[in-house]
Swiss-Prot record:
<dbReference type="GO" id="GO:0016192">
    <property type="term" value="P:vesicle-mediated transport"/>
</dbReference>
<feature type="disulfide bond">
    <location>
        <begin position="72"/>
        <end position="89"/>
    </location>
</feature>
<feature type="domain" description="LDL-receptor class A 3; atypical">
    <location>
        <begin position="162"/>
        <end position="203"/>
    </location>
</feature>
<keyword id="KW-0675">Receptor</keyword>
<keyword id="KW-1133">Transmembrane helix</keyword>
<feature type="disulfide bond">
    <location>
        <begin position="96"/>
        <end position="113"/>
    </location>
</feature>
<keyword id="KW-1015">Disulfide bond</keyword>
<comment type="similarity">
    <text>Belongs to the LDLR family.</text>
</comment>
<protein>
    <recommendedName>
        <fullName>Low-density lipoprotein receptor class A domain-containing protein 1</fullName>
    </recommendedName>
</protein>
<feature type="domain" description="LDL-receptor class A 2; atypical">
    <location>
        <begin position="115"/>
        <end position="161"/>
    </location>
</feature>
<keyword id="KW-0449">Lipoprotein</keyword>
<feature type="disulfide bond">
    <location>
        <begin position="83"/>
        <end position="102"/>
    </location>
</feature>
<feature type="domain" description="LDL-receptor class A 1">
    <location>
        <begin position="71"/>
        <end position="114"/>
    </location>
</feature>
<dbReference type="InterPro" id="IPR050685">
    <property type="entry name" value="LDLR"/>
</dbReference>
<dbReference type="InterPro" id="IPR036055">
    <property type="entry name" value="LDL_receptor-like_sf"/>
</dbReference>
<feature type="disulfide bond">
    <location>
        <begin position="141"/>
        <end position="160"/>
    </location>
</feature>
<dbReference type="Pfam" id="PF00057">
    <property type="entry name" value="Ldl_recept_a"/>
</dbReference>
């Protein structure tokens, strides 16, 4: 007498199901599930790594790779140095002056100050008529003889604007100034202009 096995909904008998426990019907789903779990774990690990790197850059305030990204314009409309907080703009002459002005001290960083002016970004440096002399870029066209030969004020390459309202134009007798003197020096009974115009023509401040 033949033994009859009950049939399931899919037409397979119970014996056939037991005879193939690792067949395609069950084993394929298990393999796919394991592969999906591995992919999910790898993706989560990658996302966690990226998030950690972003947090590190944000916390430590790592510097920009390009020196040009550190340039800015100060409140006095002069070239400045942008601190790593991306908010503080300090004067060019405040870089490598021995005083840490930026929060993280990047304005006094060894990479900037190890061989001044060669180690400074180009936007912080202005060259004088004497090739051996240089000044900070914010000292150009400020009315003061910073180069010593007035090339930072009178050179055709410099192209400085005319004397401002707080200045009097004349050939100065003082080494500190070039072709303009501050108006507060007018009519102080001291000759500041070679033509004495500071005492007789300048209306004063």
């Amino acid at each position: 007498m033949n033994k009859v096995f009950p049939q399931g909904e899919n037409g397979y008998t119970a014996a056939e199901s037991k005879a193939h426990p690792g067949g395609e019907a069950g084993g394929g789903h298990l393999c796919c599930s394991r592969r999906g779990a591995c992919l999910s774990a790898s993706l989560l690990l990658l996302l966690a790594t990226v998030a950690a790197l972003i947090a590190l850059v944000t916390i430590l305030g790592l510097p920009s790779c390009t020196p040009g990204a550190q340039a800015c314009i100060t409140l006095t409309n002069r070239t400045g140095f942008l601190c790593h907080d991306q908010r503080s703009c300090i004067p060019a002459s405040g870089v490598c002056d021995g005083v840490r002005t930026c929060t993280h001290g990047e304005d006094e960083d060894e990479s900037l100050c190890r061989d001044v002016p060669q180690s400074l970004p180009h936007f912080l440096v202005a060259h004088c008529g004497d090739p051996a002399s240089w000044i900070y870029s914010d000292q150009k066209c400020d009315g003061t003889n910073n180069c010593g030969d007035c090339s930072d004020e009178l050179s055709p390459v410099t192209v400085c604007p005319p004397c401002g309202p707080g200045w009097w134009r004349c050939p100065s007798t003082f080494f500190k100034y070039c072709d303009c003197i501050p108006r507060h020096l007018c009519r102080d009974h001291v000759q500041h202009c070679s033509d004495w115009s500071d005492e007789y023509a300048c209306p004063g401040p």
